[in-house]
Amino acid sequence: MAQLKITQTKSYIGSKQNHRDTLRSLGLKGINTQVVKEDRPEFRGMVHTVRHLVTVEEVD
């Protein structure tokens, strides 16, 4: 199954609280932190919520 490599590229300062909570739920704690998650609808939805703060790459 494919996986997603999610990298936080921008700071959450000034963002809404739900965006901060979503970043924390994804495991992102600061700029340039990366996590690898399974490619599932739950994670796709979280990434969509904070798409302006992160970059996403598909990893095999």
Swiss-Prot record:
One of its GO terms (molecular function) is structural constituent of ribosome. The keyword Ribonucleoprotein applies. CDD domains: Ribosomal_L30. Keywords: Ribonucleoprotein, Ribosomal protein. PROSITE patterns: RIBOSOMAL_L30 (PS00634). It comes from the Bacteria. GO terms for cellular component: cytosolic large ribosomal subunit. GO terms for biological process: translation. Pfam families: Ribosomal_L30. Belongs to the universal ribosomal protein uL30 family. NCBIfam families: rpmD_bact. Part of the 50S ribosomal subunit. This is Large ribosomal subunit protein uL30.
